Amino acid sequence: MSPRPLNVGVIGGGKGAFIVHPQQRAIFFDGTRRVTAGALSSNPQTAIEAAENWPFPIQGYASYDAMIAAQKALPEDQKLDYLLIVTPNHAHFDPAMKALKAGIPVFCEKPLCLTLKEAAELVKAVRKYNVPFALAHTYIGHWTSRLSRYIVRSGLLGDVRWVDSSYIQGWLATKLEATGQTQAAWRTNPKLAGGSGCGGDIGTHALMQLRFVTGLDVKEVSAHLETFVAGRKLDDHFTVYCNLSNGGNALVRASQICIGHKNDLGIAISGTLGTLRWRAEEPECLTIHLPNQPDRVYWRSAVSPGDGFLPKETPAELMAEPTLPSGHTEGFHDAFARLHRCFEADVRQWQATGKFVADGSKYATIEDGWMGMAFLETCLKSSGKKGAWMALPRKI
C-alpha cells in the first residue's frame, strides 16, 4: 500500500501572489503531496477569505501562528508534514523559525531572509532541532542543471578558470511600482525586500547556479549595485566580479532594466579543457564546446554516455531520472516539482528515522541560504565603497 500523501501548509500566497501557483502545481505533481491548509495573508480576515476562495478545499487560518499551534491537537494523518513559505522576503524568518521550533519541516522561497544575522539564527535552529529545510532555488531543479553539475564536478571541463552566471530581465525598466503592481511594489521596497532589490530577487539565483554546478564558493567580491530608474529605492542592476575558492574568477550579474529580456538566466563555465553553456529559457539542452571539435548539444532524455565526452560511468541514477521522452518539454513547473520530490524523500526519511542530512545535491539547503545572504551583504558593503574588493565571511 502506498504511503499517504504528505500534507503541506502554505504561508502567504493570497491575492496578487505569483510564486505560489507554480509551487502549488509542483506539490501536486506526483500525487504524493497535497496542500491541505494555509495562512494566506498577514491580514486575518483576508487570510480566511483567501482560503475560502482557494481552487480546492483547504483549512484556512487567520495567521501562521494559529496554523502552527493547531498542529499539536490534530490526528497524525491530518498534521502538516511541511510548510511552504511564499511571502515577501521580510516575512520569511519568523514563520520559518517558529515552524522549526515546532518540529515542522520548511520549504522556503529565496532569499532566505532579510539579514545575515537572521540567516545565522536559522542555520543554528535547523542544526539544533534537526528539522528538514529547503530553499526554493528553482533552476537547479532542471535535469540539465544536474547534468551540468556532473560534467563540471567530474573534471570533464578541466580546472574551472572562468564562470559567467547571469539573470537578465526587463520588466522593471520603468517605475512599475508606482502603478500599484503588487510584485513590483514589494520587490522595490527595502522594508519588504531587504537591502538589495535586483541582487536579492534574481542575483541570488545566478549565484546559486554557479555554486550548485561548479561546487566552488565565492571568496571575494568587487560589487557594483546601480539604480537606473529615477526614484527607485533599491538596485535594479547588479554586477559582481568574484574570486573563486579554486583560484578562478567569475562574474555574477543580474539586471531588471534590460528591455526585451524575460527570465534570461544563463551560465557559461570555461575550464582548461572546454566550455559549458546553459540557459533557463532553453532548459532542455546544454552545449559543450571543445577545442577543434564540433559543438556537442545534450538534450534531456537523449543523452548517451560513452560518446567520447560523457564517460560510460555517468551515474545511472542521473540518466534514469527524466521520465518524459526528449521533445516533450519539461519546464518551470517540472523544475519546481523535482525540488519538492527530493525534499519529500528527505522528509519521509526523517519521519521514519529521525535523521536529516542534506548534501546540497538535490535542492538548496539552509547553508546555501546563509551563503546567499553573506554574498548580498558583502556586495552591499563593496558597492558602498565603489567596488572595493571585500572577502566574504567564513562559512558558519
List the model feature ranges, each with a label.
Residues 1-55:
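N-terminal Rossmann-like dinucleotide-binding module
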Residues 1-4, 328-331, 338-396:
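C-terminal helix-rich "cap/oligomerization" subdomain common to oxidoreductases
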Residues 36, 58, 81:
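Conserved acidic residues
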Residues 61-80:
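A structured beta-alpha segment of the ubiquitous adenosine-cofactor-binding alpha/beta core
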Residues 82, 88-141, 155:
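Beta-strand-loop-alpha-helix segment that lines the small-molecule cofactor/substrate pocket
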Residues 132, 139-232, 286, 386:
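Predominantly a Rossmann-like dinucleotide-binding segment in NAD(P)-dependent oxidoreductases
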Residues 200-285:
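Glycine-rich, aromatic-lined ligand/substrate-binding cores of catalytic
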Residues 244, 273-363:
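C-terminal glycine/acidic-rich active-site capping loop/insertion
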